Amino acid sequence: MRSTNLKNIRMGRDHQKLLNNLEEFRKTAKLTQEELSVKAEVSRKSINAIENGVYIPSTVLALKISKTLNCNVEDLFQLPED
């Protein structure tokens, strides 16, 4: 198994493995990070980390956020085209 230096991997809106539109959808819904975090039952720090590409959400969290923002998970998070 090959070792990867995780400090050099940037996840999130411009990560090569996941494109992230959360901040745009949150702002369109006129929600602060705090308001979204309360509605999605997650910490504000988690929302911030997702938006800033530090954290890729679990399937359950992605579903909670998309339900809160009344959109599909695929609207928020997409795989980049090859």
Give the label of every model feature segment:
Residues N20-K39, K64:
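Short basic helix-loop element that most often maps to the first helix and adjoining turn
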Residues E41-Y55:
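Recognition helix of helix-turn-helix/homeodomain-like DNA-binding domains
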Residues V60-D75:
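DNA major-groove recognition helix of helix-turn-helix/homeodomain DNA-binding modules
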